[in-house]
Structures are given as structure tokens and as C-alpha cells.
Regions:
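A short beta-strand-loop-beta hairpin characteristic of the jelly-roll/cupin
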Residues: 98-118
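A short glycine-rich, His/Asp/Glu-containing loop-to-beta-strand
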Residues: 59-79
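A short hydrophobic beta-strand segment most commonly corresponding to one strand
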Residues: 93-98, 121-123, 137-155
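Conserved metal-binding segment of the jelly-roll/cupin
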Residues: 115-129
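Non-heme Fe(II)/2-oxoglutarate
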Residues: 1-64
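Intrinsically disordered, low-complexity polar regions and short flexible loop motifs
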Residues: 46, 161-163
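Short, conserved beta-strand element in jelly-roll/cupin
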Residues: 76-78, 88-104
């Protein structure tokens, strides 16, 4: 199956009316599974973020008003899925926190292809052309967080600084 644009299981605007009952049941199962997995890998993700991008980590720790985080979604990519190349439209720094990986699933950003690894943070500017494909055998689940670039820049964090810290 080919998905022309990113398809996330749930977005910040999803309501119960957006889903059939069977979809809600599978969403609840996915949500519960994801929460359990996030709790398992959170210490590793936190350590990864602290060591790889200390400036950003410090900024989100101080973000008590929640102004930096624009959206948070759970993305499930099933085997055989391809998301066509596209560019985001919300001008954000997009972070991927993998909670269930499959070596056959990958994401390409600016022509650089990489797989998701549980416990390893991956981030990019959502305006960069990106696409994904899943040739593996089981679902890949990622928590995706979008952070407001303008708010980050007000705190001295630019895309260039982020890429420098992550050696992108």
C-alpha cells in the first residue's frame, strides 16, 4: 500500500468520531502498547538526548509552559507500507522516538536513509523532503514530537546548532 502523505494513528486533533469502533479498539491497544514501551525505553532516550543534544534537552526541561511542543503523535508503520516523498508544513523540529523497531523499515531525509533504533533519538527539520518505506515483517512504532522552531530560536537553538550537536 502507498500512502501519499504521512499517516499517523492519532494526532492532536483526533476525536472519537474520527474512528470506527474497530479502529478505536486497535488505537487503544496501540496506545497502551506504546505507553508501556515508552516507559521501558525512556531512561535510554533521556540519556541519549542529554548526551547528543544538551542545549535542546536543557530547553525542553525548562519548558514549563509547554510552548515548545506543537504536536505529539504515535506513528505506526505496517509492513509493505510506503510513504511518498513530502515536506512538512508546520515549520518544526521533528523528533522520532522509536519504541518498536523493524530493521526493514527506514526513513530517508534529504537523501540520507536510516533505520529507527529503539532508544536512539532521530530528528530533522520537517520542511526537509522525507519519505519512508517498510519492507520488514512487523509493525514499527514511533512517537513523533514536533517542536516550534520559532520558540527554539528564541532560546538560541537553531536547526544548524541542532544538526551540529547531532553531527547530521
Amino acid at each position: 500500500k502507498v500512502i501519499p502523505m504521512p499517516l499517523n494513528v492519532v494526532g492532536t486533533t483526533a476525536t472519537e468520531e474520527d474512528f470506527e469502533l474497530s479502529e478505536m479498539v486497535s488505537f487503544v491497544e496501540l496506545f497502551n502498547t506504546t505507553v508501556e514501551k515508552v516507559q521501558e525505553v525512556l531512561p535510554k532516550l533521556t540519556a541519549s538526548m542529554q548526551s547528543l543534544c544538551p542545549t535542546f534537552y536543557s530547553a525542553i526541561q525548562e519548558d514549563v509552559d509547554g510552548m515548545l511542543l506543537k504536536s505529539c503523535t504515535i506513528s505506526k508503520l505496517t509492513p509493505g507500507t510506503k510513504i511518498n516523498p513530502h515536506s512538512g508544513d508546520i515549520d518544526s523540529l521533528r523528533l522520532h522516538f522509536p519504541v518498536i523497531e523493524d530493521e526493514g523499515a527506514w526513513l530517508s531525509v534529504r537523501g540520507r536513509k536510516r533505520s529507527w533504533k529503539v532508544g536512539e533519538l532521530f530528528a530533522f527539520h520537517d520542511h526537509d523532503k522525507h519519505w519512508a518505506q517498510h519492507n520488514g515483517t512487523h509493525d514499527r512504532i514511533v512517537v513523533i514530537m514536533d517542536y516550534a522552531l520559532s520558540q527554539l530560536e528564541d532560546r538560541g537553538i537553531t536547526i544548524e546548532k541542532w544538526e551540529e550537536e547531532l553531527a547530521i
